[in-house]
């Protein structure tokens, strides 16, 4: 499965690397950034107390877009990985981890509308833990979860700053490539259970969940002042087959202030709402997450403020 996912990621971007430029028209446009954001604190005989800490987040973003005779193919890779080290002896704490790949093929319908087919993949690089309860209790890893989405629809591009893709025919697969998490029903897959007709027969949890519905993705990338840029991505998904009014929400925002050609300051937020993703309460007897999941309307929210270096590639 890992080979399949990495193949999908590389096909979309490698094609652009070997594309030849037309003598009259540049068919491919490529741009990207690589960055490293960090902070550090150190205390020696500090009366008020404090913890030595080192925090870093690495990012890689790349776009490879093709356009010719009313046909376009837009490919975007967005990745980040970050850790915090306290006292430089304890196990590092993961603060950011993202792999997102989208590939959209569009055929011009009108001046501002395109027929579209979009493939999207989302997962993470490293293991994730519930650090508030037990730093050895793994709650995520590569492909646990992993999301693969394929949708057919229409894209509206009114200007160079905004686009919206609506795909009323969309299939989505949620992958949980971890047996322990699958048995608990993590990330909405069917949990393992005992056969009601035979209490000794354990039915294993599923490693994938399949959905069919509608997906809307709106993107905004606009300069709001000199050296200040704001970008936002809102993704909504409705599952036709199970409570279609329970809309999944994934909303990412980032404000970037460029100090100079390589130094920048940024603040990023990420909000997720998915009714089907269960949460596990803490068992007071063990101080560990309970084996009984709780489904419900919990909003996931993350905010990252960082200062660092960024270079164009």
Each language-model region and where it sits:
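Outer-membrane beta-barrel translocator domains and adjoining extracellular loop/strand segments
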Residues: 44-48, 87-91, 128-135, 176-183, ...
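Outer-membrane beta-barrel "beta-signal"
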Residues: 299-313
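Repeated loop/turn-to-beta-strand initiation elements of outer-membrane beta-barrel proteins
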Residues: 71-73, 112-115, 161-164, 227-230, ...
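Transmembrane beta-strands of outer-membrane beta-barrel pores
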Residues: 36-42, 68-70, 79-85, 121-127, ...
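Residues on the lipid-exposed face of transmembrane beta-strands in outer-membrane beta-barrel proteins
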Residues: 32, 36-38, 58-66, 101-107, ...
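Extracellular loop and loop/strand-boundary signature of outer-membrane beta-barrel proteins
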Residues: 45-50, 85-91, 134-140, 201-206, ...
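Transmembrane beta-strand segments of Gram-negative outer membrane beta-barrel proteins
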Residues: 24-40, 71-73
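Bacterial Sec-dependent N-terminal signal peptides
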Residues: 1-25
């Amino acid at each position: 499965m890992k080979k399949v996912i990495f193949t999908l990621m590389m096909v979309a971007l490698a094609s652009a690397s070997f594309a030849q430029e037309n003598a009259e028209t540049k068919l491919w446009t490529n741009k990207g950034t690589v960055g490293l954001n960090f902070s550090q604190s150190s205390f020696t005989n500090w009366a008020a107390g404090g913890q030595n800490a080192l925090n870093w987040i690495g990012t890689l973003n790349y776009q490879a877009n093709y356009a010719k005779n009313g046909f376009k193919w837009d490919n975007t890779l967005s990745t980040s990985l970050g850790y915090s080290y306290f006292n430089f002896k304890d196990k590092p704490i993961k603060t950011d981890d993202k792999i997102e790949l989208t590939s959209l093929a569009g055929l011009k319908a009108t001046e501002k509308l395109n027929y579209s087919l979009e493939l999207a993949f989302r997962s993470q690089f490293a293991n994730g833990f519930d650090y508030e309860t037990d730093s050895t209790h793994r709650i995520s890893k590569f492909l646990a979860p992993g999301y693969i989405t394929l949708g057919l629809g229409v894209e509206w591009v009114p200007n160079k700053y905004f686009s919206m893709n609506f795909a009323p025919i969309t299939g989505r697969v949620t992958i949980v490539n971890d047996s322990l998490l699958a048995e608990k029903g993590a990330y909405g897959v069917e949990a393992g259970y005992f056969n009601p007709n035979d209490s000794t027969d354990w039915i294993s949890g599923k490693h994938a969940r399949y959905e069919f519905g509608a997906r809307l993705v709106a993107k905004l990338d606009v300069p709001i002042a000199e050296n200040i840029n704001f970008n936002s991505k809102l993704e909504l998904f409705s599952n036709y087959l199970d409570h279609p009014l329970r809309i999944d929400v994934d909303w990412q925002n980032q404000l970037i202030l460029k100090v100079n050609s390589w130094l920048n300051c940024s603040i990023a937020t990420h909000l997720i709402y998915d009714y089907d993703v269960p949460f596990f309460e803490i068992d007071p007897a063990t101080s560990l997450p309970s084996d009984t999941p709780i489904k419900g309307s919990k909003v996931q929210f993350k905010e990252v403020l960082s200062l660092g270096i960024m270079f164009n590639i």
